Amino acid sequence: MADPDRYNKMFPVSWEQLHRDTRALSWRLMERGPFKGIVAITRGGLVPAAILARELEVRLVDTICIASYDWKSQGGISVLKGVEGDGEGWLIVDDLVDTGTTARAVREMLPKAHFATVYAKPSGRPVVDTYITEVSQDTWILFPWDSEIQYVQPLVNRRQEG
């Protein structure tokens, strides 16, 4: 998990929940389109972008490759691959907007694109145009590609241990 001083809660997202939430996002985006294409922010935006591409019948999908997180913390922005143009007619997709650092960097590169995320936290929410679910700033979202199924102690047992 990430920095324990920054994240007090955990929000596990299953593959099924992510799919439902991304389909809900597609309903909101239908009235904004059609889009020329989708730009997925790697790596978190890849799965939502694939679902949105299917639901919105978008065949052109590109990526912006940015590194800002590791499994422990959020760091500085490193653009590994950009995209040409100003983003007009394009849909930018990411799984989450947290502090807004990554989103602001992408906004600077593609100022005319429509920016959508599945999940949004209060600090980053103003940077995106469309999102589905808001979670508190102190919540770590555990995405299905970052986890595996394992046994977890019942809450009452964990409380007694701690």
Curated annotation (Swiss-Prot):
Mg(2+) binds at D95. 5-phospho-alpha-D-ribose 1-diphosphate binds at R43, G44, D94, D95, L96, V97, D98, T99, G100, T101, T102. One of its GO terms (molecular function) is xanthine phosphoribosyltransferase activity. Pfam families: Pribosyltran. Gene3D superfamilies: 3.40.50.2020. PROSITE patterns: PUR_PYR_PR_TRANSFER. Transmembrane segments: none annotated. GMP binds at D98, T99, G100, T101, T102, W140, I141. InterPro entries: PRibTrfase_dom, PRTase-like, Xanthine_Guanine_PRibTrfase. It catalyses: GMP + diphosphate = guanine + 5-phospho-alpha-D-ribose 1-diphosphate; XMP + diphosphate = xanthine + 5-phospho-alpha-D-ribose 1-diphosphate; IMP + diphosphate = hypoxanthine + 5-phospho-alpha-D-ribose 1-diphosphate. It is found in: Cell inner membrane. Xanthine binds at D98, I141. Its EC number is 2.4.2.-, 2.4.2.22. Keywords: Cell inner membrane, Cell membrane, Glycosyltransferase, Magnesium, Membrane, Metal-binding, Purine salvage, Transferase. Its main location: membrane. It is a peripheral membrane protein. Pathway: Purine metabolism; GMP biosynthesis via salvage pathway; GMP from guanine: step 1/1; Purine metabolism; XMP biosynthesis via salvage pathway; XMP from xanthine: step 1/1. NCBIfam families: PRK09177.1. Homotetramer. Belongs to the purine/pyrimidine phosphoribosyltransferase family. XGPT subfamily. PANTHER family: XANTHINE PHOSPHORIBOSYLTRANSFERASE, XANTHINE-GUANINE PHOSPHORIBOSYLTRANSFERASE. This is Xanthine-guanine phosphoribosyltransferase. It comes from Oleidesulfovibrio alaskensis (strain ATCC BAA-1058 / DSM 17464 / G20). The gene is gpt.
